[in-house]
């Protein structure tokens, strides 16, 4: 009754619009409540991640199903449910629905609508499987219409859409046999493996009418290809894809490498037969290769072009990681290489099986010998013994594969241009020159040589050392084979057997010349030998245990640049000679400040009377040299007055002095100047001391006899005494005057030093000069005062100098 009543009151279009609107309102409210609003990325891709929980089933549609409708009403409900789920997930795509179509819409206009609707949204509808009712609905939708639906096509305008809908949905789901793993993965991510089984069965049932709609298949295939490019999962291995999701893309797991091998085996035939670019034939490999190397974050950013980086990983007969990290950084590559080579020993035969369609027979032997080389190298020396050979072989192998692969030569040559600067930054210069100078065909022999010789890793220190010394560029014909890498000894000279005929280099250029001859002096490439090797270590052939002869040669070469060291030693003797000169000369003033002060200002305090005269004479000479103008300015008049007074007392003294001159030296020479001052210059004055000298002169004259003689020489004695005092005064007057001035100057200098230190900025950079001068002057003044106090003559010279002008 209910079904009949609704079918009478509502037409098919009105019923579809009503059910879609009612269910849409319910589902949108549920989406808003649960926070599962569709993202813009999901809408653009026409696909969903399958991680959001399914919405609640439409209640009104469920009631209609439980009431048992007819076949036509169930089809209408399925269409409405399909539109509802699709519109709730990708609403901008499904703006055109049944209610917005014009009555005159033809089959061609409605046919692309539902295929596009189904090709975009079945993934979303399948990503949100609900209870058993929704799953049964989807299954009925995929199985096809009832026999009554084609008969009703001419009666209702929407029947072409309904009749096209079952045909369009298999076409929209044609990616299921082509890509069953993706559907299964989404089903597993949403509900589990049981839904994926139902989807696979449905896809298998509808596999027959897939090719009926080529245009719609092209649209759906384009959308699926876009989804595949956005999602980096491969096409052919669904169990490994689920394992990849669970394992988190670990680099060291063998599942990942096996998966790559399976990708190669499945896509190798289409790739090389059709000769299309890699990203067109199977676009998921370029996206999967970054996922493979996501753990090693540095190698991928270093390779600037994603296409050359992904093509060697999909086509070259070597593992993915040994190529890409070795291109970018050799040091980082060898941290990654042991993991990849040791964890995937079984993947090498798979890659070798995938190469015969495109690569010559020489490349088939490369993977067989490569694991021996990579696994035989000790892991304890990843930077020195492993860096140069492994990266060299892998890079050359990459270039060789680029020359052999049909569609990849240009891109890999572009990749090689980017690769070479990065390799040259972490490898010897000779390896870089070898890469740039060799033709492409020559790299084939080098790859075969560098891989099949197991002793290559142990020889890398020699190549690095000699490459640091000499940078050579080798030009080899395309058909010939090359010798060892640049800078090493040739195989003919070292005794090592080579895979191909060894050809001597024809052109070699020397970066810098040294005093010791090098390999470039001989045209055959053999070392001239004796300067490089010490006598204890003759040249020996290289072996797997390592070549001590080559290392000794490098040691000898490393010592060679130290020949200019005698030049440095030539500069060392002058400090030694200066030190010895300082040790020999005790009066050197350039060593320390106290010695400098002792040299300039020091007169040691000596209490012995024997040295006083010499000290006073030295000080007098020093004073006359240092202060001549001062003495002449202050004390010239006093000396002139003194000389006039003495000349007034004895006007005839000069001729008498000549006659009596030989007598005084005997008694006056041993007398010091202070004693002369004490004897002659007292507080009483010069005239009071004159009778004291008379008995001395009388005793001298009494020895000659005669009273007349004693009375006559009185005047000569007085004149002699005046002459002696005058000479003493003339000799002492500069010293007396300077002694006075030196005391005053010392006091003035001490005051000046105190003022300078107090008023200057001691934080300035030049404050040390002021402090140094003030300290030196003050210390000299203090020492002078101490010397004067020790003698006890500080006050008398001043009084005598004041008494002289009074005469």
Curated annotation (Swiss-Prot):
Region (Disordered) residue spans: 29-80, 121-391, 517-548
Post-translational modification Phosphothreonine, affected residues: 534
Example GO BP: regulation of DNA-templated transcription
Composition-biased stretches (Basic residues): 180-194
Induction: By PPARGC1A, PPARGC1B, ESRRA, ESRRB and ESRRG.
Keyword Heme applies: no
GO cellular component, one term: nucleoplasm
Phosphoserine modification, residue list: 198
Matches recorded under InterPro entries: Perm1
UniProt keyword terms in alphabetical order: Cytoplasm, Methylation, Nucleus, Phosphoprotein, Transcription, Transcription regulation
Modification Omega-N-methylarginine occurs at: 548
Biased composition range(s): Polar residues: 162-171, 195-211, 311-346, 363-391
Low complexity bias (residue ranges): 40-52, 145-160
Signal peptide start-end: none
Tissue specificity annotation: Highly expressed in skeletal muscles and heart with lower levels in brown adipose tissue (at protein level). Muscle-specific expression is increased by endurance exercise.
Entry superkingdom: Eukaryota
Subcellular location: Cytoplasm; Nucleus
Functional description taken from the UniProt entry: Regulates the expression of selective PPARGC1A/B and ESRRA/B/G target genes with roles in glucose and lipid metabolism, energy transfer, contractile function, muscle mitochondrial biogenesis and oxidative capacity. Required for the efficient induction of MT-CO2, MT-CO3, COX4I1, TFB1M, TFB2M, POLRMT and SIRT3 by PPARGC1A. Positively regulates the PPARGC1A/ESRRG-induced expression of CKMT2, TNNI3 and SLC2A4 and negatively regulates the PPARGC1A/ESRRG-induced expression of PDK4.
Name of the protein: PGC-1 and ERR-induced regulator in muscle protein 1
Organism: Mus musculus
């Amino acid at each position: 009754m209910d079904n009949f009543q609704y079918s009478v009151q509502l037409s098919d279009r009105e019923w579809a619009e009503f059910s879609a609107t009612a269910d849409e309102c319910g589902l949108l409210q549920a989406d808003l409540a649960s926070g599962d609003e569709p993202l813009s990325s999901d809408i653009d891709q026409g696909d969903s991640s399958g991680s959001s929980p399914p919405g609640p089933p439409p209640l009104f549609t469920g009631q209609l199903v439980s009431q048992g409708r007819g076949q036509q009403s169930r089809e209408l409900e399925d269409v409405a449910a399909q539109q509802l789920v699709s519109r709730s997930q990708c609403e901008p795509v499904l703006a055109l629905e049944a209610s917005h179509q014009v009555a005159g819409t033809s089959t061609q206009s409605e046919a692309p609508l539902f295929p596009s609707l189904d090709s975009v949204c079945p993934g979303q509808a399948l990503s949100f499987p609900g209870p058993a009712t929704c799953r049964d609905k989807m299954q009925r939708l995929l199985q096809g219409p009832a026999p009554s639906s084609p008969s009703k096509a001419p009666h209702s305008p929407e029947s072409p859409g309904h009749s096209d809908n079952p045909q369009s949905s298999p076409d929209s789901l044609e990616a299921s046999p082509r890509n069953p793993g993706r559907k299964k993965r989404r089903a597993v991510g949403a509900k589990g493996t049981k839904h994926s089984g139902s989807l696979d069965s449905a896809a298998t049932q509808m596999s027959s009418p897939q090719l009926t709609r080529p245009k719609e298949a092209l649209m759906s295939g384009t959308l699926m290809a876009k989804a595949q490019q956005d999602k980096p999962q491969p096409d052919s291995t669904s169990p490994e894809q689920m394992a990849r999701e669970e394992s988190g893309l670990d680099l060291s797991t063998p599942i990942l490498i096996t998966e790559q091998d399976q990708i190669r085996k499945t896509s190798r035939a289409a790739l090389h037969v059709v000769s299309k670019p890699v990203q067109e034939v199977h676009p998921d490999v370029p996206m999967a290769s970054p996922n493979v190397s996501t753990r090693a974050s540095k190698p991928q950013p270093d390779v600037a072009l994603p296409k050359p980086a992904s093509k060697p990983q999909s086509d070259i007969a070597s593992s993915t990681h040994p190529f890409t990290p070795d291109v970018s950084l050799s040091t980082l590559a060898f941290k990654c290489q042991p993991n990849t080579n040791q964890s995937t020993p079984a993947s090498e035969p798979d890659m070798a099986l995938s190469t015969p369609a495109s690569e010559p027979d020489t490349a088939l032997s490369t993977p067989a010998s490569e694991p021996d080389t990579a696994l035989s190298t000790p892991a304890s020396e990843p930077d020195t013994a492993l860096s140069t050979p492994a990266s060299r072989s892998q890079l050359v192998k990459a270039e060789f594969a680029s020359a052999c692969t049909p569609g990849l030569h240009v891109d890999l040559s572009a990749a090689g241009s980017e690769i070479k600067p990065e390799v040259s930054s972490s490898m010897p210069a000779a390896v870089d020159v070898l890469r740039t100078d060799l033709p492409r065909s020559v790299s084939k022999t080098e790859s075969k040589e560098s891989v099949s010789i197991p002793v290559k890793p142990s020889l890398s220190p020699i190549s690095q050392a000699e490459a640091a010394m000499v940078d050579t560029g080798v030009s080899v014909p395309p058909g010939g084979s090359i010798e060892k890498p640049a800078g090493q000894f040739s195989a003919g000279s070292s005794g090592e057997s080579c895979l191909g005929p060894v050809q001597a280099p024809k052109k070699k250029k020397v970066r810098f010349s040294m005093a010791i001859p090098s390999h470039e002096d001989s045209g055959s490439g053999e070392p001239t030998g004796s300067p490089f090797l010490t006598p204890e270590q003759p040249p020996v052939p290289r072996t797997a245990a390592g070549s001590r002869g080559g290392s000794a040669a490098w040691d000898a070469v490393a010592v060679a640049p130290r020949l200019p060291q005698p030049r440095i030693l030539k500069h060392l003797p002058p400090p030694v000679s200066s030190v010895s000169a300082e040790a020999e000369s005790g009066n050197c003033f350039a060593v320390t400040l106290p010695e400098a002060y002792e040299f300039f200002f020091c007169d040691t305090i000596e209490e012995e009377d024997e040295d006083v005269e010499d000290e006073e004479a030295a000080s007098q000479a020093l004073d006359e040299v240092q202060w001549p103008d001062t003495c002449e300015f202050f004390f010239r008049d006093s000396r002139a007055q003194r000389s006039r007074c003495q000349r007034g007392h004895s006007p005839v003294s000069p001729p008498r002095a000549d006659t009596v001159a030989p007598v005084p030296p005997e008694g006056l020479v041993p007398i010091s100047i202070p004693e002369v001052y004490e004897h002659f210059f007292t507080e009483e004055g010069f005239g009071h001391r004159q009778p004291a000298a008379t008995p001395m002169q009388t005793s001298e004259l009494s020895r000659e006899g005669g009273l007349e003689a004693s009375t006559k020489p009185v005047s000569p004695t007085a004149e002699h005494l005046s002459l002696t005092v005058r000479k003493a005064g003339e000799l002492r007057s500069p010293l007396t005057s300077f002694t006075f001035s030196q005391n005053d100057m010392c006091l003035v200098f001490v005051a000046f030093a105190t003022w300078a230190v107090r008023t200057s900025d001691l934080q300035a950079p030049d404050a040390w000069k002021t402090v140094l001068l003030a300290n030196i002057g003050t210390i000299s003044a203090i020492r002078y005062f101490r010397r004067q106090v020790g003698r006890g003559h500080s006050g008398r010279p001043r009084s005598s100098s004041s008494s002289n002008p009074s005469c």
